[in-house]
Amino acid sequence: MSLVSAVTGDESRDTNGAEQSSVYQSAGKPLSKEALYRAKLKYGVFQSPAQSLKAGVVNGKDASDTAANLATSNKTTIEAYKRLLNPNASKAANAVITPKKTDQSRPASAVVSSAASSAAIAAPKAARSRTSSTASTTVTYVNSSSSSPLHSKTPKMDITKVLAGAERNAAESVHQRTNPEKVSYVRGITDRSVGKAADASFSLTSDIVSNLPTKKEYIQSAEKESHAAEWAQKAVAALKDFNPDDVTDKNWREREEERKRLIKNLTSETVLTKAKLNAQQRLDTIDRETSQRAIFRNAEYNRAAASVAQENLRKTRSSASATANKVNLGGGLWLAPDDIDNIAKGLIAPVLDEVDQRTGAQRAMDIDIQKRSVDYQQQYEEWVNIQTEKQNNDSLLQAKAFENHQKETADIEATLAKKFQNLCTQKDSEVAKLKEALEAKKAELAKLKEDNEEELKREDEMITTECADLQKSNENELEQAKKDQEELLVPFKNDLAAAEDHHTELQDQKGKIEENIQELRDSIEKHKSHVEELNAQIETQQQQLETETEALNLQSESHQQLKDGIETNYVIMAEKAKEEAKVSSEEARVKQLEVDAIINERQTELSNTEIEVKREKLKLIDAMKEVAEVKNEDKIDEEKAKAFLGTTSGEFLASQKKVEPATKLQSDPKLSEPSSKSTKIEGVTGNVKADVPASPPAHKKHSIGGLTSPLKSKKKSDKDQKGSSIKKFFGLKPSDQNKNTKTTQPTPLKSSPKPSNKPVTATVTTEKKENVEPKSTATETKPSLEPSFSGFSQGSVHNKVEQSDASEVEGGKEEPTSKDNRKSLFKEVF
């Protein structure tokens, strides 16, 4: 008996007005709704919306008719285990139960507080959302009750062991229901040794299987024992005056359809939400009904509950004498041990009879098995005799077969020896003839070797004289070829030196630009700190202004001081605006310098690619020299030189003389300043132009696809040039050579208005376009609207790009080309 049931049992009222018997209280009054709900939560029983079970009938007069209907509809067969408790119900119940806390040992004086805490542990999560005032009142009551214990004659209760045992039994019962134990129903005696002997000697025969009862026979015997015919006659007599409409509910069909629908959707969200809603509504109604007598918020009510609990304990102890030496079977039933023994004997007697019957059958089966084992032993001995006789006969047959086999082998060996002797004499005569022929061939071979040695001596003398003459002529030709090739390499070396100088100058400029950027950033930080100081002064002035405006109504004499403060505030605000303007201008300058630095980097990358191209060409010319030396040629192959350079060696020297002034202008440091204009690169095969567009700042670099990583493009171009140079070194196919004879000028670079995924370089594109005839096309770039580089700009301007036509060479003459003009305007609006 719990403390909650003892307290609330006296004040609970029945809705029907009549008292009902209950197993929870000795007085016969039912528990409160809150106590019943908490007991259900504690033992895992949760009301599911899919199951609407009614306890009894609405009208007591119809109880007999309902019992008759249930008796006729009751199935007499024993069905398999069915889990009536919904698994989702236990999950929902666990979701609202608070986690169990470990209770420390408490003194006997704090019985009331321990009972309250144990009931609070089993409460749902909805009970935790109560106000802090409730918790404070509970704490004060616990302290007061523990400090001033109640004095009574009866000893104090300690129901911790009772609660622990109840919880343990409830957990075991729930575990048995959710995970039922699988019982192995074995026929025969349950003794282990006897069972092992039966397993070793028992065999199912057709007679035993035919004598086993079937499922149908079990069902028939169960129906005979249930007296179904008698119950049916009583049910027919009871149904004469039965009207099903009076018993059944009007909304029964709708509720049955709703129940079926919910059973189908047990795992859906709607069922869970409805279950949560029902639980919350139930908790709300309980809170509303018991608000005036809440257990944990009313100290006086708790004291009264403790006194009532002690009185009930005294009554139960006084009434314990009536049930002494008796066993409680539940439902208020107490029986003596003798009665229980008589009932047990009546129940166990049929079981013992069945055991005797089965043991008799088992003994008969053992006798049958013993007879069969004797027959089996006799048959086995007969089989062994037959096998021994068979083995003796087999040994005699094997001895005779062995003697016959030896005779046959001796005859065969004699015939084979005669044949072998005849064969040896025949082969010896053939070997003698072959030896005579071998001696004749050896004499012929010696004579042939002498003749060949004389011829080799004459050939060696002739070859030495020819090699000496050929070596002298090759040395003279090699000296002449080296002189010619050094003359060809002079312009390449000049271009390489100029490009390296230009590269070093660009690196110096890059360092200066980075220093300027760092200085400007430092100044920006200083201005920002100054702006913050001015903001602080403005705040102080504003506070002072507010205080002075309040004092203006009281003191008219401070009007002039207030005016001076306002003027100083305006001056500080003007200084702040000035500093902000300086910061914005310096930030714009920093961004423009970053743009110049990016342009400078692109120009350095462009010069690096040009240097690599020229070095690769020098390597290829050296390789062509080595090829000419190996082939003993005076000059380099003009066809390959034309395929590589675009012109012959003579035309190339003439064009290099015209290119020298342009290379000097390129090496001028005044022309190498970072600007947004295009850079003109003089190639080795003519004037090849490449536009280097102004790069956007770092935070807008993703909007332009024309400037990607130069290292990847550089590696790719180097691989392409190496592959094409190897192709030039080993020569071309005849079809390719015919096409390359028409190509006298490399294809000019085309500038596409769309952003390219590769960096813009001024490399010679004849390696990739050997089989394509040159086409001179002029592409016009339309002005595109690009974002400005300032964070304070109010708009964007057009970047106008004008590109002239690429240079074309016709008939070995070179036409002058116009310079590329690319201007990037950065408009700053403050």
Swiss-Prot record:
A GO cellular component annotation in the UniProt record: plasma membrane
Compositional bias (Low complexity): 128-148, 741-761
Any one GO biological process: eisosome assembly
Membrane topology: Peripheral membrane protein
Signal peptide as annotated in the record: none
Function recorded in the entry: Required for normal formation of eisosomes, large cytoplasmic protein assemblies that localize to specialized domains on plasma membrane and mark the site of endocytosis.
Entry protein name: Eisosome protein 1
Primary gene name: EIS1
